[in-house]
């Protein structure tokens, strides 16, 4: 079968790799000059099953109100005269109940753990080098109330098989001595031994190279303009995708199946077909610093809960990323938010890096209100979805690619996840006190 994959980030490239492994003819289309040039370019570097608690949780509404108007707030909702933003916001609030949060955690843990194991197998199979470290992820807290409120979600994750173990402040510093300078401010933490870190850009580029060598055709500098369809109801299908190629010519490409893996831009592509995805861009920031004093820089990947920042050591670089700005599709850098990242990183590790020459970056995370992605079938028989991975694209990417390849090939993915367009039954779970 001939399959066209739209998008070459970690999700699209993984989809292409597994589709090719299953014997399909695969074409990947992306508007950038190479793979992983947008949201997969410079994220926080964490493969973090332990980050399964979504932004939408019972404590979120009050926090969002408290942070309104603060330019350096971890989650900044900047109201716009835009119906989709407000509709997304209302759906976000609906996901903040304990019951919805618990079910979303279950879904996210399932696909994330499946993806972590898939990534490990891919690493062993391909030998791709991407500055990966399998040293776990350490969350630390500087607010007792926030630490206490994290315990129910951590317990639920443990019950679901994610070993997110709560530890005291002394154990936090024992595991990561680079935090010794703020020991008096740390109230506790949790450590997930099976989590990892690595450079998603390096990995995706490496996988794209190997996929191309295996016969996947990549068409870069090529813009997708629309999808053509025919028929209605059960007989509806996509007949082709209109593109503008690298020479500026309009063309229509045909295939048997199409995979939409265009992140935040998936929503606008599919809307003319009557497919409404609840995806809105969440602008995330990262800063990359050259490490000048390796002994002072952290080795374990960290999550600073109070500032909603993640820290990953990528070879001789330190990547610090986080925050979320709900403010449309603009990718311009906000100076206040950039400076807040450097200020906090310097507080944590004052002698570790060259803080005078940071490399700042923004990317648009494709956020669903629940943080659960769309993976699976659409109402159009030969159109498939692999999008909406939010803050966990790197964590979920490899497994999402493997799962969509199975679905297109008529197979049942080996993971208990609510794939779109497929029957799914799961036991009801409730978020309980720790």
Label every PLM stretch briefly:
Residues 86-209:
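Rossmann-like flavin
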Residues 2-28:
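N-terminal Rossmann-like FAD-binding beta1-loop-alpha1 element of flavoenzymes
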Residues 43-51, 55-95, 180, 220, ...:
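Active-site substrate-recognition segment that forms the wall
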Residues 151, 155-184, 191-280:
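Predominantly flavin-linked oxidoreductase catalytic cores and closely associated redox partners
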Residues 164, 305-306, 330-332, 346-434:
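C-terminal catalytic lobe of FAD-dependent flavoproteins
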Residues 21-41:
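Glycine-rich FAD pyrophosphate-binding loop
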């Amino acid at each position: 079968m001939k399959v066209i994959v739209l998008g070459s980030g970690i999700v699209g490239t993984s989809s292409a790799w597994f589709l090719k492994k299953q014997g399909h003819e695969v074409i990947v289309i992306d508007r950038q000059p190479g793979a992983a040039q947008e949201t997969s370019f410079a994220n926080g570097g964490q493969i973090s099953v332990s980050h399964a608690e979504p932004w939408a949780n019972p404590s979120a509404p009050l926090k969002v109100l408290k942070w309104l108007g603060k330019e350096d707030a971890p989650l900044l909702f900047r109201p716009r005269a835009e119906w989709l933003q407000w509709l997304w916001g209302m759906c976000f609030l609906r996901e903040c109940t304990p019951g919805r949060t618990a079910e979303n955690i279950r879904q996210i843990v399932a696909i994330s753990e499946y993806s972590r194991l898939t990534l490990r197998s891919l690493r062993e199979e391909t030998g791709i080098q991407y500055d990966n470290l399998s040293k776990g992820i350490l969350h630390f807290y500087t607010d007792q109330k926030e630490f206490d409120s994290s315990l129910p979600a951590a317990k639920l994750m443990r019950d679901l098989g994610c070993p997110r173990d709560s530890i005291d402040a002394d154990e936090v510093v024992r595991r990561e001595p680079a935090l010794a300078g703020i020991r008096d401010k740390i109230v506790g933490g949790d450590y997930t031994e099976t989590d990892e870190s690595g450079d998603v850009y390096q990995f995706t580029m490496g996988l794209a190279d190997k996929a191309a060598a295996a016969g996947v055709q990549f068409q870069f500098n090529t813009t997708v303009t629309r999808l053509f369809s025919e028929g209605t109801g059960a007989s509806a299908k996509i007949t082709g995708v209109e593109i503008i190629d690298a020479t500026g010519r309009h063309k229509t490409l045909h295939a048997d199946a199409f995979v939409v893996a265009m992140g935040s831009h998936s929503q606008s592509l599919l809307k003319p077909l009557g497919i409404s995805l609840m995806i809105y861009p969440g602008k995330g920031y990262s800063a990359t610093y050259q490490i000048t004093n390796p002994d002072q820089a952290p080795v374990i990947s960290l999550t600073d809960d109070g500032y909603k920042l993640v820290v990953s050591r990528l070879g001789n670089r330190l990547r610090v990323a986080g925050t979320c700005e709900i403010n449309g599709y603009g990718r311009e850098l906000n100076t206040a938010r950039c400076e807040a990242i450097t200020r906090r990183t310097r507080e944590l590790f004052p002698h570790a890096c060259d803080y005078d020459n940071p490399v700042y970056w923004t990317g648009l995370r494709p956020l669903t209100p629940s943080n659960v992605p769309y993976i699976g079938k659409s109402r159009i028989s030969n159109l498939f979805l692999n999008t909406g991975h939010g803050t966990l694209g790197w964590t979920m990417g490899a497994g999402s690619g493997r799962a969509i390849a199975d679905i297109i090939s008529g197979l049942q993915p080996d993971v208990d996840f609510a794939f779109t367009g497929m029957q799914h039954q799961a036991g009801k779970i409730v978020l309980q006190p720790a």
